[in-house]
């Protein structure tokens, strides 16, 4: 029986490239001259630091622009609150990895409401979709692409 998996993953090498490009742009931009601003990539988050909170807003836009240029979806970013410490401002942007249970249930409900002849199963942080016909699976893929659940989804492990 044909099947595929729905996952939500972030290519960390692309994120690293986007962060490096954003750091380069901050160093060359005129409005960031003489400002101690930087992006720092940790395991699952990007920490931004600047001298003013409006600069953090500009830095988020720079980061989003660089991520889009790397071919990724910006819905994988979860922007945190601005923190003030001394004379610097910090903000943490978390990277969304995996499909949470409540999002998975909403996705399964969307597929089941369409009355497509497929079965769905939650397997950890991914969803397995199986069906008798390849066309049904492609229809389910189209539904998932149209669903706006605040997260980017990819399809892996397609088997006939």
Swiss-Prot record:
One Gene Ontology term of the molecular function aspect: nucleotide binding
Alphabetical list of InterPro entries matching this protein: DUF520, UPF0234-like_C, UPF0234_N, YajQ-like_sf
Listed Gene3D superfamilies: 3.30.70.860, YajQ-like, domain 2 (3.30.70.990)
UniProt cross-references to Pfam families, sorted A to Z: DUF520
Keywords, alphabetical: Nucleotide-binding
One GO cellular component term noted in the UniProt record for this chain: cytosol
Domain of life (superkingdom): Bacteria
Functional note: Nucleotide-binding protein.
Matching NCBIfam families: PRK05412.1 (NF003819)
Recorded family membership: Belongs to the YajQ family.
Protein name, entry field: Nucleotide-binding protein Tola_0795
Species for this entry: Tolumonas auensis (strain DSM 9187 / NBRC 110442 / TA 4)
């Amino acid at each position: 029986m044909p099947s595929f998996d729905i996952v939500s993953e972030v290519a960390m090498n692309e994120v690293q490239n986007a962060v490096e490009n954003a750091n380069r742009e901050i160093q060359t931009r005129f409005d960031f001259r003489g400002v101690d601003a930087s992006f720092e990539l940790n395991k699952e988050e990007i920490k931004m630091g600047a001298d003013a909170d409006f600069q953090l807003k500009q830095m988020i836009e720079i980061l989003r622009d660089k991520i889009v240029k790397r071919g990724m979806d910006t819905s994988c970013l979860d922007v945190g609150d601005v923190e003030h410490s001394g004379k610097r401002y910090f903000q943490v942007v978390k990277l969304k990895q995996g499909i949470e249970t409540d999002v998975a249930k909403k996705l399964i409900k969307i597929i089941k409401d369409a009355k497509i002849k497929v079965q769905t199963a939650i397997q950890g942080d991914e969803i397995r979709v199986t069906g008798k016909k390849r066309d049904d699976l492609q229809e389910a893929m189209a539904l998932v692409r149209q669903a706006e659940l605040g997260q980017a989804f990819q399809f892996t492990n397609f088997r006939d």
